[in-house]
Design a protein with these regions (language model features):
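Helix-biased "structured C-terminal domain" signature
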Residues: 1-586
């Protein structure tokens, strides 16, 4: 068999692919290659997914088909090993009370009487970083996955690299602030760690360049010429009408970062891609392949025009948008003729062991502490790297302003609403409670509760604002019900099925009619049936009377059996739990 070795990898692509695929099969995962893209020469991307659980999927990119597949499989192990596929979901009562929730080496810290942070979690540096004003309480740090307040705070062990000491970091903090940043899997420990550290640099320097509107030096043509595959990819993009800028993002040779920007003159927009790796050529190739990962050439019209409003560019919400899908704003200043830094023909390359040491030296020089959690329970090395102040995707204040577990106490109540028979006043009190707790009207209820609902029911599109319409109907407050119904039609209609949209049109009409004291409703019944259909009129009438206000929502028990999508997620997680238990019992 042919052996293909590429820079930065400690095994042949063929060996990695065969090993990863066999391990996934052994673990019981049924993976398929769902789609491939090869929009320009030397740029491939692939989407792989679990046939049994649609929520488990990854994308891979590379200069060849094999490199892209190895990339996707590596990312799959990264997300399985770190439990990232399950980061947004409640795992149910059984797992919450099982021997372990995340890993057998997790540690639980009971909540204290005064709700202060318990002794033993975090170190002094982390406490100062996450809780400078002493506003953080223990109950804020219950993890979404278990939601088990009786058990306390679940914290995971990370190794502090400066002294190899174990530090316990709450899963709640990891999930809320770092999401997928700094996660990696690889053929060897050093290969994966280099990738994870490179990603931290890539995202941090990207944010700095964008936020500070730094103008970067272009990579000279003679340097680009060393990488003919990249040159051919760029030439094809330019021939298709997309001007390309290739920049040195190292900020004077300090960081292993490249930036490539694509212009789309057809609609006046631009898109900046960043990549990082100790090897200049690897970083450049990654940046170009990232530019088109999961995109064909006709998908390059969804970005934003450059702007002179540098304040808006620097806003945290804009940087978050860049992290999610790179569609945020870019300043025109990035493209100034006179760069803020000189071009440096940098190289931090060596063996993966040397590269890890080199990257760690950069963090040390900046007095940045690095925390690493290693995972080998699936037979593939993976890690999660945290560098507070550099690898955070969201600010520490999100722990109390936008914590992913802030709706956990509502889960049982909201899931029981369909079929409930409360006093009318109690439904209206729940609206008041949602307001008092500061839940955004646009928040999807399934995300607030950590549920995989599937797309075939009303829970999938339900937002807090629509829920308020239902609660107002149940509480008999028709004025409030009309206001929230109209909110729902304005802000949620685009994601509704035709049937649900028609129901809300009918409901709005009946609510408006209810305000007309001098009109007799029966006079309009025939016209309403002709306009909206008998089913919609019947459903809207039942909502108006308070009999059936929760249209399209089925009652859900604590086992979540009503949601097959959530069950498939739990089945996938159970496979991982078995592998963890077996590995840690050795």
């Amino acid at each position: 068999m042919t052996q293909t070795f590429i820079p930065g990898k400690d095994a042949a692509l063929e060996d990695s692919i065969a090993r990863f695929q066999q391990k996934l099969t052994d673990l019981g995962f049924n993976i398929e290659e769902a789609s491939w893209l090869n929009p320009v020469p030397h740029v491939w991307s692939v989407h792989i997914r679990d046939k049994d659980c649609a929520l488990c999927f990854t994308n891979g990119k590379g200069a060849t088909k094999k490199a892209a597949l190895a990339s996707a499989l590596g990312e799959y192990f990264e997300r399985l090993s770190t439990n990232y596929f399950f980061a947004d979901f409640w795992l149910g009562e059984t797992i919450a009370n099982g021997p372990f929730v995340h890993y057998p080496n997790e540690k639980w810290f009971p909540l204290t009487e005064n709700d202060e942070l318990p002794e033993g979690i975090l170190d002094a540096r982390l406490r100062a970083f996450y809780d400078l004003e002493n506003e953080l309480t223990g109950s804020m740090l219950i993890d979404l996955q278990s939601g088990n307040e009786d058990r306390g705070i679940c914290a995971l062990p990370f190794t502090r690299q400066s002294d190899e000491q174990t530090v316990y970091i709450p899963m709640n903090i990891v999930g809320n602030l770092y999401v997928s940043n700094g996660m990696s899997a690889g053929n060897t420990r050093n290969e994966a760690r280099v990738q994870g550290l490179s990603e931290v640099f890539e995202r941090h320097i990207k944010n700095r360049i964008i936020a500070e509107s730094i103008s970067l030096p272009e990579i000279p043509a003679d340097v680009l010429a060393r990488y003919p595959g990249v040159v051919e990819s760029i030439a094809k993009l330019e021939a298709e009408g997309f001007p390309i800028f290739a920049y040195d993002g190292s900020l004077g040779g300090k960081y292993p970062v490249i930036c490539v920007v694509l212009f789309n003159p057809a609609n006046g927009t631009c898109f900046a891609s960043f990549g990082a790796h100790p090897d200049f050529g690897v970083a450049l190739e990654r940046t170009v392949t990232e530019l088109l990962q999961g995109r064909s050439l006709k998908d390059l019209d969804v970005f934003t025009p450059p702007t002179f409003d540098d304040e808006e560019v620097a806003e945290h919400t804009n940087l978050e948008t860049h992290f999610i899908d790179s569609s945020g704003l870019i300043s025109w200043d990035m493209f100034k003729q006179d760069a803020d830094y000189p071009f440096v023909d940098w190289s931090f390359a060596g063996t993966t062991e040397e590269e890890f040491a080199t990257l760690m030296a950069i963090f040390n020089a900046e007095d940045q502490e690095v925390y690493i959690a290693d995972y080998e329970h699936l037979g593939v090395y993976a890690c999660r790297i945290i560098v507070p102040g550099m690898s955070d995707i969201y600010p520490a204040e999100d722990l109390w302003l936008a914590n992913n577990s802030m709706g956990a106490h509502l889960r049982e109540t909201l899931l029981a609403l369909p079929g409930s028979e409360w006093d009318k006043e109690d439904y209206l009190n729940l609206i008041a409670q949602l307001d008092e707790e500061g839940h955004d009207d646009f928040t999807r209820v399934r995300e607030l509760l950590g549920l995989a609902t599937g797309k075939d029911n009303g829970w999938y599109t339900l937002r807090i604002g629509e829920l308020k319409a239902m609660l107002a109907l149940a509480g008999g407050d028709l004025d409030q019900a009309l206001a929230w119904t109209e909110w729902t039609m304005e802000f949620n209609q685009s994601v509704f099925s035709a049937e649900r949209t028609n129901y809300y049109r009918c409901l709005q009409t009946l609510l408006l009619l209810s305000q007309e004291d001098d009109r007799e409703p029966l006079q309009y019944l025939n016209a309403f049936v002709r306009m909206y259909g008998a089913d919609a009129v019947e459903a809207a009438s039942a909502a108006l009377s308070g009999e059936e206000p929760f249209y399209g929502l089925q009652a859900v028990d604590s086992d979540l059996k009503a949601f097959p999508a959530h069950q498939s997620l739990l089945n996938a997680y159970e496979k991982l739990q078995k592998a963890k238990a077996a590995y840690w019992s050795k």
